[in-house]
Amino acid sequence: MEEKYLPSRVEEKWQKFWEANKSFRATEDKTREKYYLLEMFPYPSGRIHMGHVRNYSIGDVIARFKRMKGFNVLHPMGWDAFGMPAENAAIQNKSHPAKWTYENIAYMRGQLKKMGLSYDWDRELATCDVDYYKWEQLIFLQMYKKGLAYKKISSVNWCPKCETVLANEQVEDGCCWRCDSNVDQKELEQWSFRITDYAEELLEYTYKLPGWPERVLTMQRNWIGRSTGCEIDFPIEGQMDKIKVFTTRQDTLFGATFMSLAPEHPMALELTTPENMATVAAFIEKVKKTDRIRRTAEDFEKEGVFTGSYCINPVTNRRMPVYLANFVLTDYGTGAVMAVPTHDQRDFEFARKYDIPMGVVIQPEGEALDPQTMAEAFTAEGIMVNSGRFDGLKSGAAKEQIADYLEKEGIGKKTVNYRLRDWGISRQRYWGNPIPMIYCDLCGAVPVPETDLPVVLPMDATFTGEGGNPLDKVDSFVNTTCPQCGEAARRETDTMDTFVESSWYFLRYCCPDFVSGPLDKEKTEYWMSVDQYIGGIEHAVMHLLYARFFTKVLRDLGYCDIDEPFTNLLTQGMVIKDGAKMSKSKGNVVDPNALIDKYGADTARLFSLFAAPPEKDLDWSDQGVDGSFRFLNRVWKLVYDTLPIIGGAGALDPAGLTNEGKGLRRQVHKTIRKVTEDIEERFHFNTAIAATMELVNTIQSFEPKNSPQNAPVLKEAIESVVMLLAPFVPHFTEELWAQLGNNKSLEQAGWPAFDSAAAIDEELLVVVQVNGKLRGKLTVAVTASEDDVKGAALADERVKPFIEGKSVKKIVYVPGKLVNIVVG
């Protein structure tokens, strides 16, 4: 054994061993209990960062621990490889997105292997591989047949410079995340997935996921946004049309004095009178340039414009002016809001600003409200007034009666509304999965026949940086023939949102080489669902919701039999340095390559796991990294120094141990119990490592080390340290394990067995108090009786001065913990 720990030499040796022996290859085995561990796969941006190191180290600890516990572990890795950054790089570097992407994948794969991560690389996939995305095209066609994929005109975020649609999360303070241009709202025909068909089931199952953080489930429930209320029709004055409104506050209907429409509402211009057209059109253009999320903020200035038209309140028959309001969106309800200024704060501020009449219809019990003197809207429950037959009722109780009345009179109906909107998947960019549709002047939109799949992304597109979709300019791709009539036709040039690829990759990992369809049902039945999924909370309402939706769709299409993709979810914290999240813009990035070159991957892993619990943010510390490296050197030296002593150790005989030996063995098995519980039950890796460090300290102070009688227990202690550290620092421990004379790998050797008898304390530390104040401590035998402990407390030399000459009133004994002597 080398006297000095040389990380690079040790790590290179074991990485080669694992690769040559396919040590982490997973195969289906129904005789063994499976465990599917997965971290969210990365975008191949070019380099891994410390966030990756932490995330993947967390997952690797769990995977290695489960293997040592005897589970059949699936732990795959792949690449979320489509996306706009590849096109940006192609423009900047005058190369092709495919070349840039695959070069990055090769480099990052090498980085992940250098970290010693126990992936089954035989299952590696990249979403830009045609062997992956062709099956996604098939799924799209199946969804199209079922009516789950459709095309509609919708309002989208549009960057005029990039000439593409932006997702909400790609709009930052009203500007494009890529070029910083002002983002407009634009009406475009977009392909969408009907996720709203699954809204109720998606919501219901948030109450059936006990292994998910409640914070994530709450975010999803709020995003789905189920609310019960009424749809009410407001007749338009002088027309046959009606404005349909959804409200959860039908109890305030009698107080509705004006109507607010979203500027994007389809009736906005229809209802605008000629004399108001110029003002309204200018207002609509202004709102189009405003960030949609900002428009709903409480501190956002509420503005509107009168259309010149009126509608009629169906229960009071009062005229209500119709306004366009910047805070109303088409994303919720119908895009029209019956405005009740006395009972809604936004409506209150708007009515005050534009001098719109107000009327109180709910007031606190025993108090009369005057609209002229109200400082703010009254939004609490109260007593109905000025509401016809409903006067005198409590507003909460009146809701159901008013809903029944509206249905009986044909004015409205009870309904359930969702904040969730269908998922728009069209993207006007090249580096994505082509949508398999064809447009024919005679036949309209025609799906590509399944036998003609895949629609392959052409490699001869050019990237000029001038905006627009490069696919539009590839004639050989665009021009085709109609599958129905054989006439000239054009291909769809929009590609799918990259969230589509990440919505089912975890299923494809179960059968990456399956050639007869998207999924091998037998293999997915064995592996799914994912037992532990790991990723950032920023994906709570996008990726995690889409993945749940897609799993249910694939179930209903007959590809799998599961309802939910992820049984347990861990959302890890960020890596913080100098008080901020690591980022290039802040100049506080730590390069994992430099860290690994200096200290080795095991030190990088150990620090990232020891510095904080997984769900908390990790504060970077150079001293912490040094400390982790010193600890590994200490363990290495301990093994090196004791190897001559324990090399020829005989079998362990617990009955023949000295008191010192029993004490060491007790500490060993207490540590095994704690580390096992910390990993298995809580993922508290930091406390598991701390407990192992304490055991190392105990071994180092253990005397006499050189006694042949103590060699077996010393060997057990050393081997236990190595085994307990194995999931955290795998190269380091495999090398020590081999040096200790073991032929099997650590994962074959298994997790150390806990001996409950060995962990039992023979002595206890009991605190002694006099009148509730600490006066001494006793070490007593576990078997000591209550009388024995009380007698020892009274006889203790440190206690005597506080009780001499005083009367002992009583002695309180808390078994195994404390004695309190009450004197007077």
UniProtKB/Swiss-Prot annotation:
GO terms for cellular component: cytosol. A motif ('HIGH' region) lies at residues 42-52. It comes from the Bacteria. Keywords: Aminoacyl-tRNA synthetase, ATP-binding, Cytoplasm, Ligase, Nucleotide-binding, Protein biosynthesis. One of its GO terms (biological process) is leucyl-tRNA aminoacylation. GO terms for molecular function: aminoacyl-tRNA deacylase activity; ATP binding; leucine-tRNA ligase activity. A motif ('KMSKS' region) lies at residues 581-585. ATP binds at residue 584. CDD domains: Anticodon_Ia_Leu_BEm, LeuRS_core. The keyword Nucleotide-binding applies. Its EC number is 6.1.1.4. It is an enzyme of class 6 (ligase). Signal peptide: none annotated. It is found in: Cytoplasm. It catalyses: tRNA(Leu) + L-leucine + ATP = L-leucyl-tRNA(Leu) + AMP + diphosphate. Belongs to the class-I aminoacyl-tRNA synthetase family. NCBIfam families: leuS_bact (TIGR00396). This is Leucine--tRNA ligase. It comes from Geotalea uraniireducens (strain Rf4) (Geobacter uraniireducens).
